[in-house]
């Protein structure tokens, strides 16, 4: 799918181009694109994954920061006049601008490893406009996104992602599928925003703060981490054991803490 125009991957953009056609076909199958859907790809590179999707949907938006790649992308995909290229930084891009009241967007991409976590937080803040997301990420990031309470990788990213979305780790992709080959395994993740939040918080900033405080010293107990925020009476009212470590709490527990602190502060 990807053509052979020369372009050296740029380290500052975190570029690793996917060239394994078998993996590309498998990703497209997981996405399951349909004609007429509004699919947005972040960092299309030379268009390997893009071609597999737009061949079905017949239209597509892509967000690409590397201006030198855009002419290559347009040449590779010249057969698709309904390809819209946005030369922009995905970290600052307003994805809601591509939605309509009738149609949410689907977001896909082989995300640059160096900005994958902040980019996911940026997308989660616009989750109401997104039907689902399929990303290639460093395997450890996917493991963190999908981690459950008690897992060693369960943390701030796990809680906030799962507050907004159902998260599924789909399959692992080895370094040999990329040029240049990264030093670690990658994985495909599916994130599907909840149509109705199962545990809505009254103030999202408070939830973010309580999760950040909770995990700032993950080997310490909740009593220690929330010192000055919650006392023993508060933990009793919440029915949460203050001797637990933060990785034992689920999303609902953190939401209850946030809502409790909002009410307590009046």
From Swiss-Prot:
Function, as annotated: Specifically dimethylates two adjacent adenosines (A1518 and A1519) in the loop of a conserved hairpin near the 3'-end of 16S rRNA in the 30S particle. May play a critical role in biogenesis of 30S subunits.
UniProt catalytic activity: adenosine(1518)/adenosine(1519) in 16S rRNA + 4 S-adenosyl-L-methionine = N(6)-dimethyladenosine(1518)/N(6)-dimethyladenosine(1519) in 16S rRNA + 4 S-adenosyl-L-homocysteine + 4 H(+)
Sequence similarity: Belongs to the class I-like SAM-binding methyltransferase superfamily. rRNA adenine N(6)-methyltransferase family. RsmA subfamily.
InterPro entries named in the record: KsgA/Erm, rRNA_Ade_diMease-like_C, rRNA_Ade_Mease_Trfase_CS, rRNA_Ade_methylase_Trfase_N, rRNA_adenine_dimethylase, SAM-dependent_MTases_sf
Main location as per UniProt: cytoplasm
Protein name: Ribosomal RNA small subunit methyltransferase A
Pfam families on file: RrnaAD
UniProt keyword Cytoplasm present: yes
HAMAP family recorded: 16SrRNA_methyltr_A (MF_00607)
GO CC terms: cytosol
Enzyme Commission identifier(s): 2.1.1.182
Broad EC category: transferase
Subcellular location field: Cytoplasm
Domain of life: Bacteria
Binding site for S-adenosyl-L-methionine: 16, 18, 43, 64, 89, 110
CDD domains the UniProt entry points to: AdoMet_MTases
GO MF annotations in UniProt: 16S rRNA (adenine(1518)-N(6)/adenine(1519)-N(6))-dimethyltransferase activity; RNA binding
Keywords noted in UniProt: Cytoplasm, Methyltransferase, RNA-binding, rRNA processing, S-adenosyl-L-methionine, Transferase
Entry keyword annotation includes rRNA-binding: no
Organism classification: Bacteria, Pseudomonadati, Pseudomonadota, Gammaproteobacteria, Oceanospirillales
